[in-house]
């Protein structure tokens, strides 16, 4: 697959978005709804280099063409709790197959932990789905974004208790679903 479809996915992600999500906290048997407004903007080459440096990741020769974005969001839960965050992210493709790209997803700030982090990604062009897997200290988050059209995305989040090294993911602690609409 060519990287142009991958780039188009990210071009479609740029803009102002609004999302309604439902989170199922399985360990507490609680369900929570939230509303998030977020903005996705491309980042400069200097910010791409900063994300690489923050993660002690080697600079690839084609850094200027890597998909890199600034994400800014504010979430309000149905309980009135507010969370705001900003971060920069970069996607470095390492393998290409006929309908898939995969590689590393770097952030200068993780969602679950206050530190830079390197995760894995896999992009399926036939489904227009970006699957990101992040290994945190206590959990592993598997986050899916499926682009239905340039103004509608479906989000699915599965968070697992981190298993012992070599064991499969099995103990789900959080399930999240979201509908994300651009320009609302």
Regions found by a protein language model. Give the residues of each.
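Short, Gly/Pro- and small/polar-rich lid/capping loops
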Residues: 3-4
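Soluble ligand-binding/transfer domains with enclosed cavities or grooves
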Residues: 7-10, 14-184
